[in-house]
């Protein structure tokens, strides 16, 4: 057996360069590049290997480990999981920063390869800089925290262990049914150790992502169930997008006259204008989808995990039977469903062929539901502040709105701004979101005029994903305009990769909605009987000792200008229109700082969310919220 002598890190780089995926006959390199923040735990091992011979890997310099790993996740998501980025950090805090990203990837079933440096395998210099010492187990390091949030975890304590570790890593990264974060911990001494690796380990490997076919028995079960129902509703999940099954999905819906609703991950797979597309469903869903969902006698979930936001905590369609088509048996088995374990496209096509001349019993309900929602959408886009103004989320901070108006010098509403942005940006532009009130507004209001232009991380709803995610999307779609839709709370959490976008000359656009607070959580607490408590951004009041002083006003445009972005301060609809048009002309990243009044986001449309309301309280409003929760639980599925 012929061998080649390399360090562990050099062998890793060489191996990654020779990994390919094949899907529907198309073959491409799997690992496009690697994000790096070098420290003592990885610079002399993996850093040396990348400097000496990176091969075809593109090497990027991150600014925050979570930020760069989030960018890697967004890249893979936008590439429909067919190509990935890796990310490497040093030991200690750098590695710990990526734990949140690992959880984000795993929650969303998005492949990402994380390569944190680790403490010495030999233990000779222990305790090294940034090492945590556990008196009961010296083998534990910061990197063990990744175990709970990774789909595959390994630690390479000897050079020869790299081979089994990486083959298993590729197994998980290329498995549509069970992909997510893969963490390979690399002790800093082992990275530099040499070994005679078999040359066969570095041969070109093609990992075929095959379309799992459904069993004949499961197809028969599905057909029997559908034929027994009059008003089925399809739920379009992210699996349809990742399977690249949009055309098959549309064909299925049209052939059998079955309307469909979208999850956050599924939205944008098919244009919003399709006559059977009801839009977002569930807690952040709209009036049309939730109305039809309550009438449906069968829910057909395709490529969806059926999270609580999709099912409205299992209350939205509690009496309907459930059919699932999912490549993951785990997800297919949810809600005690009749399950078809298969690739989305393969499953839909097999069922369609066997279903024959079935047609649903829907009449005008679908078009009427869409028309009603379109009227509501027009109203939301035209909401403007004025005399006797009532916000969408009424009864919370109504009396404080004049104070916000004066502090901001703005009367803009969040729904009005979203409508204008949707109107003016390019049809093929990609929007990116993750947290706060914006995911609800966008799932309800955003009209996708082109496919794959809606990129929402809502499996983990990671604050700080938006800007790093926009950068990752831009690397995946360099010819498109990309917009991060972000609130002020999330911007403050993490915006480090703005600098990386400037460094790389990859323009992204930040649409910053500043309502000076954690608005959606303020809604949640006040809707459940609490007051406004530590969710508005207010200064400490020396008289009360509470955070109920003056509203904090931050010039985010100045912050971004300091980094080198082209920025705009927006207080009127005219200024917004000018900024959106001018930002398209720029060649560098832009930020539009928009002051919007609180409580002007959308409200729920016939849905309920099960949250942990206090059972005991001195406040009648909290007691009422608890009673309401208990009443809604009676209407929900138990499992």
From Swiss-Prot:
Region span, Thiamine pyrophosphate binding: 437-517
Binding site for thiamine diphosphate: 65
Required co-factors: Mg(2+); thiamine diphosphate
GO BP field: inositol catabolic process; isoleucine biosynthetic process; L-valine biosynthetic process
Enzyme Commission number(s) from the entry: 3.7.1.22
Family annotation (Gene3D superfamilies): 3.40.50.970, TPP-binding domain (3.40.50.1220)
Reaction equations catalysed: 3D-3,5/4-trihydroxycyclohexane-1,2-dione + H2O = 5-deoxy-D-glucuronate + H(+)
GO cellular component, one term: acetolactate synthase complex
Molecular function terms from GO: 3D-(3,5/4)-trihydroxycyclohexane-1,2-dione hydrolase activity; acetolactate synthase activity; flavin adenine dinucleotide binding; magnesium ion binding; thiamine pyrophosphate binding
Pfam families, A to Z: TPP_enzyme_C, TPP_enzyme_M, TPP_enzyme_N
Binding site for Mg(2+): 488, 515
Keywords of the record: Hydrolase, Magnesium, Metal-binding, NAD, Thiamine pyrophosphate
Pathway named in the protein's UniProt entry: Polyol metabolism; myo-inositol degradation into acetyl-CoA; acetyl-CoA from myo-inositol: step 3/7
Cofactor, how bound (note): Binds 1 Mg(2+) ion per subunit.
InterPro entries registered for this protein in UniProt: DHS-like_NAD/FAD-binding_dom, Myo_inos_IolD, THcHDO_hydrolase_firmi, THDP-binding, Thiamin_PyroP_enz_cen_dom, Thiamin_PyroP_enz_TPP-bd_dom, TPP-bd_CS, TPP_enz
Function in brief: Involved in the cleavage of the C1-C2 bond of 3D-(3,5/4)-trihydroxycyclohexane-1,2-dione (THcHDO) to yield 5-deoxy-glucuronate (5DG).
Similarity-based family: Belongs to the TPP enzyme family.
Name of the protein in question: 3D-(3,5/4)-trihydroxycyclohexane-1,2-dione hydrolase
Organism this protein belongs to: Geobacillus thermodenitrificans (strain NG80-2)
